[in-house]
Amino acid sequence: MMIFSTAVLRLCATSRIGAVTKRASSTFLSSASSSSSSSSPTQSMPPQRYTHHQFQRHSYSTTTTTLQQQQQPSPPLSTAQLVKQLRLLTGAPMLECKKALASPDVNNDLALAQEWLRKHSSQKIGSKVAGREALEGLVGVCIDNCDGGSRGVLVKVASETDFASRSEVFTGLVQEIADAAAAAAGDGGDIVDIPTFLSNTQSITTGKLLSECLNDAVLSIRENIQLDSIVTIGTTPSSRSVIAGYVHGRAPNSTCGTSAALVEVEVLPKDGGGGDDAVLSEEEKSVAMEAAKKLAMHVVASNPLYLNPESVPVDVVEKEREILMEKMTDSNKPPEIIEKIISGQLRKFYEGICLTEQSHLVEEGNPKISKVMKGLGLVVKDFRLVGMSK
């Protein structure tokens, strides 16, 4: 009983203390509120409260205002910004960009300014640099591995200086021409008329005529740029042929170089195979591609003139034979011995100018190319070599 009374007394004391604390806290907050209201010149407003529908309307209004602010058009570019952007697009000097934008027909329109530069500056610069020698440049390559076989193209584009030929503008132009030439060669075979090709063929990447692309490059680089030659290989492709290439002296960040070669290799049908039109297996294609690539490297290094002895013109062989006969005039050897000597010297002559008769510079031990191809079940059908000095 004594223990229960003690617990009750403690509980009552705790309740009294809590009540006193609560009254003191209320008195303090009340006095603080009255003092702040008396010191403030204006009476503080109660916090704004929204009903559910009012809150929805308020949120929609705020969102609409934010979207309208985001959709406001950006301020127009300044003249300096327009000049800088036009220079980045065309590569033209600052003064010409400023002149183009200030033209009454342009009125600070970037698209019209580019057209203005093409019409006025390109013609002026083109006529100015037309007579200059263009002895530097690059060779571009494009191989189109289509369903019916492969086609390859080499294009030689010349510039005045090596510095210009290494620029991004020039390498881009060379590759554009090579890609377009590969597509054109697939439609109509060899490309002979270069001016007509440039005037009638569109860039695959930009859709502009190649002649316009070339003029744009002249405007940007300020040098004489000429498409010197277009060489094609495999324009009537076979399903059993592959083409591989090698580019030497590549420009930075480019597939173009100072010289390049393409080699076409045909896979011979195996005994009991599907015939000439049978589709190559992945293994056959891989072996043929590797062999063609190595041959292309060899071609760039050795610079052969003909594919095999049968492809050497008769007049070239006869002229070489006459030279060899003159050397043997005072030898006092029997005619049959002289003929054997001349035949041996002609074989050496073929080794120097015919691809299939040369020692393979890329294969270990430098075996004869015709022997390497026979061992792989391949035949070299054709090759092309283009270089800035060839």
Curated annotation (Swiss-Prot):
It comes from the Eukaryota. Pfam families: EF_TS. Signal peptide: none annotated. Residues 30-54 are annotated as: Disordered. Residues 30-40 have a biased composition (Low complexity). It is found in: Mitochondrion. One of its GO terms (molecular function) is translation elongation factor activity. Transmembrane segments: none annotated. Coiled coil: none annotated. CDD domains: UBA_EF-Ts. This is Elongation factor Ts 2, mitochondrial.
